[in-house]
Amino acid sequence: MESNRGQGSIQQLLAAEVEAQHIVNAARTAKMARLKQAKEEAEKEIAEYKAQTEQDFQRKLEETSGDSGANVKRLEQETDTKIEQLKNEASRISKDVVEMLLKHVTTVKN
């Protein structure tokens, strides 16, 4: 009778071990599935962030390039205006400058 009892206890232990192994395997599988899902979600977030960052960069690049062209045009206009002002000023005072130079060159001092 004692051997039947021992035999039953061994069978119970083996069954418990098999059940525990199934529980451990199920937990391991669930953990791997959660890790895989987390990895996929992280990769998706990274891709979205990267796309948004690239879009922001391209937008800013276009804005600064457009500003650069506008700045060049504005500077050219300002330069042309300034050159025209200087030409007008030079033509206005050139007669006086020529007279002053002639006076100094032709005047003899003792």
From Swiss-Prot:
User: Any idea where this protein resides?
Assistant: Cell membrane; Vacuole membrane
Membrane topology is: Peripheral membrane protein
Task: Please tell me one Gene Ontology term that the record gives under cellular component.
Answer: vacuolar proton-transporting V-type ATPase complex
- Entry-annotated residues carrying N-acetylmethionine: M1
Pfam families (UniProt xref) = V-ATPase_G
**Which keywords label this protein?**
Acetylation, Cell membrane, Hydrogen ion transport, Ion transport, Membrane, Transport, Vacuole
Q: Kindly list the GO molecular function terms attached to this UniProt entry.
A: proton-transporting ATP synthase activity, rotational mechanism; proton-transporting ATPase activity, rotational mechanism
- Extract the ranges annotated as region (Disordered): 60-80
Q: What does this protein do?
A: Catalytic subunit of the peripheral V1 complex of vacuolar ATPase (V-ATPase). V-ATPase is responsible for acidifying a variety of intracellular compartments in eukaryotic cells.
Family to which the UniProt record says this protein belongs:
Belongs to the V-ATPase G subunit family.
What is the protein name stated in its UniProt record?
Answer: V-type proton ATPase subunit G1
The organism of origin for this protein? Arabidopsis thaliana
